[in-house]
Amino acid sequence: MERPAPLAVLPFSDPAHALSLLRGLSQLRAERKFLDVTLEAAGGRDFPAHRAVLAAASPYFRAMFAGQLRESRAERVRLHGVPPDMLQLLLDFSYTGRVAVSGDNAEPLLRAADLLQFPAVKEACGAFLQQQLDLANCLDMQDFAEAFSCSGLASAAQRFILRHVGELGAEQLERLPLARLLRYLRDDGLCVPKEEAAYQLALRWVRADPPRRAAHWPQLLEAVRLPFVRRFYLLAHVEAEPLVARCPPCLRLLREARDFQAARYDRHDRGPCPRMRPRPSTGLAEILVLVGGCDQDCDELVTVDCYNPQTGQWRYLAEFPDHLGGGYSIVALGNDIYVTGGSDGSRLYDCVWRYNSSVNEWAEVAPMLKAREYHSSSVLDGLLYVVAADSTERYDHTTDSWEALQPMTYPMDNCSTTACRGRLYAIGSLAGKETMVMQCYDPDTDLWSLVDCGQLPPWSFAPKTATLNGLMYFVRDDSAEVDVYNPTRNEWDKIPSMNQVHVGGSLAVLGGKLYVSGGYDNTFELSDVVEAYDPETRAWSVVGRLPEPTFWHGSVSIFRQFMPQTFSGGRGFELDSGSDDMDPGRPRPPRDPDELH
């Protein structure tokens, strides 16, 4: 049998070599052999060492010994500001790779490791101090961490403070620097049971030293999310506060909050605003609500489901109490939902149903002036507009009354509408023709006019329409393409196509994103896909699944107490009485895995 040819090269590595080398160097140090430098710590204590070991262990010593500094040739090097016991620990680490961090040495060792550039030791000290965070030291610990650029410890301290702000003492909170308090108030993670607590935190800080701090009140109030302060508190406490009453910027913030609560503030038509985002700790969430539609057997659905994108959970809301039929329209007005019109195939409906989100109930309100189907509804300046080919009317929820308006100048079949920049826009084909046009309604003049917006995209029929950040988005029903119109610049644009077609799907705006759900996909299969478009990244992503494949459904977004929470206010603040408890709805059971595809 022929022997194999010998190897020309035999790769070899000893995994124990590094540890063996460290042990050897440590032994040489103990035997005081080949030592070529002595470090002198505070107090005059000497530490003999090897330059090569120090330079390899620390960029600080590498720069000292490898450069042209006097220390590169000196036999003795004096280190200022380093306690002897901390230098001992760092030298031991250089030779062993081990250090014992304790409550007695963590902070001074971190300071020394930061000065002498031992990042691993610094990180270990920071990790140890994270475990020691408590109510008594968290504020000082954040100061310490930021002073020494310990990002991990600083972040952990801030998370601890935000989570336990209600348990911190008044004196601790009142001595916060302005920048730190603003950072806490602006953070989504600030754990308060209600937004009133954030307001009280800011107000207490100002009242602790009014002569010096009153000038900062507008800046602080802007960091409070006033739209989510309960209405009775807004009127009884915020509006009555002298610091607010005599400050024009504060009055503007108060007016914004009142407009929001009165459904006169269209958050989708404006740019992103942190004040319009509830804090997770309050239990409020902006949710996607699905109403009606048909399942894959074409059976009508009367269920009302809501989806919380923060948790990915679905819940049942109160079922629609009547036969929905077809051709109805759905819109959100504030935090309530309105279903208008429709038909049962033989007669048209003039009825209007309102879903009251605060009590999780449906109730009929004043009927429309005219029965209709396949119309469109939108909200502009707190009023509900219903637009059909031959008529337009407007509903005022404060008086529960309808008002007839001028009809469109050019009647359009099966149009879609959206409110943008203080105007109402309608898109559709001229009655009896295939020509697509856009018309605009001015509420100040009660007049419709054609919009000279150039060549419209080649739509086969009216696309689904929504407004986001002052732009109008048009989601085609027969393709995955999406068009965008900027009414201010009178310009058209396209965004990346959706991941799939959503024929008969639904469009809504939620959390600064477009949400398209359900409908038939590219393979003509009924889909349960929910995908979202983020304008910041200009990308679509699948964010969830419907409870079941659905088409011809309506979807809107509202703010609601999605998950009930219990919360201890602690001693940092006390809330005034006042209840706004609401039915959170029933959890929707998970679908049978066999139904998923």
From Swiss-Prot:
Main subcellular location: cytoplasm
Write the record's keywords in alphabetical order, separated by commas: Cell cycle, Cell division, Cytoplasm, Cytoskeleton, Kelch repeat, Mitosis, Repeat, Ubl conjugation pathway
CDD domains recorded for this chain?
BACK_KLHL21, BTB_POZ_KLHL21
Q: BACK domain: which residues?
A: 138-239
Report the domain of life of the source organism.
Answer: Eukaryota
The record's subunit annotation is: Component of the BCR(KLHL21) E3 ubiquitin ligase complex, at least composed of CUL3, KLHL21 and RBX1.
- Pathway assigned in UniProt: Protein modification; protein ubiquitination
* Bias kind Basic and acidic residues: ranges: 583-597
The UniProt entry's GO CC annotations, sorted and at most eight, read: Cul3-RING ubiquitin ligase complex; cytoplasm; cytosol; polar microtubule
Instruction: Name which cysteines form disulfide bonds.
Output: none
Subcellular compartments: Cytoplasm, Cytoskeleton, Spindle
Biological processes per GO annotation: cell division; chromosome passenger complex localization to spindle midzone; proteasome-mediated ubiquitin-dependent protein catabolic process; protein ubiquitination; regulation of cytokinesis
A single MF term (Gene Ontology): ubiquitin-like ligase-substrate adaptor activity
User: What is this protein for, i.e. what is its function?
Assistant: Substrate-specific adapter of a BCR (BTB-CUL3-RBX1) E3 ubiquitin-protein ligase complex required for efficient chromosome alignment and cytokinesis. The BCR(KLHL21) E3 ubiquitin ligase complex regulates localization of the chromosomal passenger complex (CPC) from chromosomes to the spindle midzone in anaphase and mediates the ubiquitination of AURKB. Ubiquitination of AURKB by BCR(KLHL21) E3 ubiquitin ligase complex may not lead to its degradation by the proteasome.
Identify the stretch annotated as signal peptide in this record: none
Q: Which residues form the BTB domain?
A: 35-103
Q: Where is this region: Disordered?
A: 570-597
Q: Which stretches are Kelch repeats? A: 287-335, 336-382, 384-422, 423-470, 472-512, 513-560
By what name is this protein known? Answer: Kelch-like protein 21
Q: What is the lineage of its organism?
A: Eukaryota, Metazoa, Chordata, Craniata, Vertebrata
